[in-house]
Amino acid sequence: MIWQKLNQLQPKIKFKPQIILAIISLILAVGMSISISNKIPAQARTEKNYEEKLFETALSFTLYFEGGFSNHPADKGGRTYKGILQSVYNTYRRRRGLPPLDVTQMSDAELMEIYQGYWDNSRSATMHPALAVVMFDTAVNFGINNSVTFLQQALGLPQTGIFDTKTKEALAEGNNRNTALQMINERIIYRYKRVQEDASQMAFFHGWLARDYSLWGYVEKLKDN
């Protein structure tokens, strides 16, 4: 069982009571009254505006946790602004023939285009609403290939990090909320392993768990359509 795995990993971690309260507050803050296209009559809803609404729903959660600039010495990703690494921004500008620029100078239009890339390349739009939100947030937080790896773990597949035929077939059967929650479980397990392997990552541990448990609450309140 997943929670048995978690219990095996937890003993060395002291979880502060105030962190638990913060997690509960975050779940309540981001999880209330969430609905996808519930104000649009079903017969009038088009595929395009449904996808746009779903993207907005996913983005609203991710931006809640990716609000500002970070350059913590223990963060292996380095300089990060609104969830975008400096290295990712460098690649984005280079591919467009633009000169390098500090990530903190990134425009809102560039930010949205990069986020749209995460959405498209993770194939989130093809998924159940709950899974789409989790897949997108995982892609931003861990990278596209790693998001596929987490999905494969949740589906009980070999972890290749590639959206291959077996993954597509398994997703066709497991495109649901349970798979989304299983992905979050896999993220939590990964966090515990990460801090046990590298004590410097404890600086981020409580923030990571706040994000994961808040994501759990967020997707549980999503309507299926």
Where are these regions (language model features)?
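Cell-wall polysaccharide-cleaving catalytic domain and substrate-binding groove, primarily
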Residues: 2-225
